[in-house]
Structures are given as structure tokens and as C-alpha cells.
Amino acid sequence: MACFDVAIIGGGISGVGIAQYAAAAGYSTLLIEKGEIGGQTSANSSKLIHGGLRYLETGQINLVRKSLLERRHLLNLAPSLVKAVPFYIPVYDNSQRSPWTIRAGLSMYALLSEFDPLGQFVSVPAVHWHRFKGLKLSGLKAVFQYWDAQTDDKLLTQAVARSAQALGAEVYAEA
């Protein structure tokens, strides 16, 4: 019977990430998944690799900075799996946050991204608002566009598992 320094149960993104890290650090590593790698919780995520914009509101500055940095790393490391996607924030007369507040938050986001192009935002001119299908124009005060990233979470999880294996981890799935 083989002995391992590290045994991981669960082949979601956390499990395969730990396996990859442990194998890279030189630990003999075993990962066991009862089903398909990335086939459970990790396959049912929001599919976003987000920079943490929403965490600015609660003052989690370091988390936003770290999220933006990790997003940048993933975009660089796995460009075939992680893609930049534009997001839009409409601000209405009755919105909880004013255009000024949204602009301030997006400016902080840009600063925390260290002015990475994907940390930047624009205020979409009113003459272009009609181009957004389904956008209610009545009471609309502003529209901001910023960037985040999206992935196929299952494929990303499987790629990390293959990397863990290449680093020496033993991975058993559908056991």
C-alpha cells in the first residue's frame, strides 16, 4: 500500500488547486474524487473570475487587490480558458447608489488594479444606451462599463488537475 504526504478528497477547484500546490512543493500527493473532476460544485459556479468589485463596499481593500491580481494571473496563465468580458452597471433615479458613488467605486477598482487595462472603466455616453437590448431607458441616469473575466469552470478545474498530475500528484476520479 502506497503512503502519501498529502491526501485530498474532492476534485473541485479547491481540491485540485491544493493537489497542484502540494505536488509542486514536492509532497507525494493523492487526490480522490468520487465523480468527474470539476463535475460537482465547481461546475455550477457563476463562472466568473471576478476582481471583487462588490467587496469595495464593505471595505475589503486587500481582498479586492488580491482578487484583481489573481484574475490577471489567470488571464495570463490560461488565456484559452479565461476571457475578459465587459460588464455594465445602469444607474437609475431610484438606484441605491448614485452615479458619483459608482464612479468613485470604479475609480478605486482601477487604482487597486494598478491601472491594468481590465481594471479601467468608462461612462457609456447616453447616445449609446439604446444599443443595450432590454435596458429600461426611463429614469436612467448613467451607464458604466467595466471588465471582469469568465471561464468554463469545469475545464479550468480539469486543467489544474492535469497540471497537478504533471507535477507528480496521483489523481483518481470516478472511483
What are these regions (language model features)?
Residues 19, 23-24, 163:
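Gly/Ala-rich phosphate-binding loop of Rossmann-like dinucleotide-binding domains
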Residues 47-133:
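Dinucleotide-binding Rossmann-like beta1-alpha1 core, especially the glycine-rich loop
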Residues 23-43:
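Glycine-rich FAD pyrophosphate-binding loop
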Residues 17, 50-51, 155, 159:
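Short amphipathic alpha-helical face segments that pack within enzyme cores
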Residues 168-175:
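A conserved beta-strand/loop element that lines the FAD pocket in flavoprotein oxidoreductases
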Residues 1-14:
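Beta1/beta-strand and adjacent pyrophosphate-binding region of the FAD-binding site
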Residues 129-167:
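Helix-loop-beta segment of a Rossmann-like dinucleotide-binding subdomain
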